[in-house]
């Protein structure tokens, strides 16, 4: 029998997280820790960074989605993440469009391939 798949975690504003929760990604692990964080105006950078690091260390999470404007707040933590799993993807929010120039993970991925590799 196949094992359980990996979860998607999300760190974002209320609209983003609610959308993903309505899509069915919300889970609690065996320790009753959720796989999401709603970032509000009173959420501290330390809370965001701690949650991000907790998601990195959970073996049940395969992908972490984070609003790009929130990723900017903890860029040093994202840049320090070198493993391929969990994959970290920066996504837009309703108020903040995606800017590929700010996505350090995308820049790193682009450096892994040459133009020949993509033909």
Curated annotation (Swiss-Prot):
Instruction: Name the chain's protein.
Output: V-type proton ATPase subunit F
Which branch of life, at top level? Eukaryota
GO CC, one annotated term: synaptic vesicle membrane
The processes (GO biological process) annotated in the record are:
pH reduction; proton transmembrane transport
Q: Which family does it belong to?
A: Belongs to the V-ATPase F subunit family.
Q: Which gene encodes it?
A: ATP6V1F
The protein's topology relative to the membrane is:
Peripheral membrane protein
Q: Where in the cell is it found?
A: Cytoplasmic vesicle, Secretory vesicle, Synaptic vesicle membrane; Cytoplasmic vesicle, Clathrin-coated vesicle membrane
Signal peptide positions are none
Please give the function described in this protein's UniProt entry: Subunit of the V1 complex of vacuolar(H+)-ATPase (V-ATPase), a multisubunit enzyme composed of a peripheral complex (V1) that hydrolyzes ATP and a membrane integral complex (V0) that translocates protons. V-ATPase is responsible for acidifying and maintaining the pH of intracellular compartments and in some cell types, is targeted to the plasma membrane, where it is responsible for acidifying the extracellular environment.
Q: What GO molecular functions are on record for this protein? A: proton-transporting ATPase activity, rotational mechanism
């Amino acid at each position: 029998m196949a094992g359980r798949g990996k979860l998607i975690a999300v760190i974002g504003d209320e609209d983003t997280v609610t959308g993903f929760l309505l899509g069915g990604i919300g889970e609690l692990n065996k320790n009753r820790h959720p796989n999401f964080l709603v970032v509000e105006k009173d959420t501290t950078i330390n809370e965001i960074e701690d949650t991000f690091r907790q998601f990195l260390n959970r073996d049940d999470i395969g992908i972490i989605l984070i609003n790009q404007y929130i990723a900017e707040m903890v860029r040093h933590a994202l840049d320090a993440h070198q493993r391929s799993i969990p994959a970290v993807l920066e996504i837009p929010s309703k108020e903040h469009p995606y800017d590929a120039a700010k996505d350090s993970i995308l820049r790193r991925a682009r450096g892994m391939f040459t133009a020949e590799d993509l033909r």
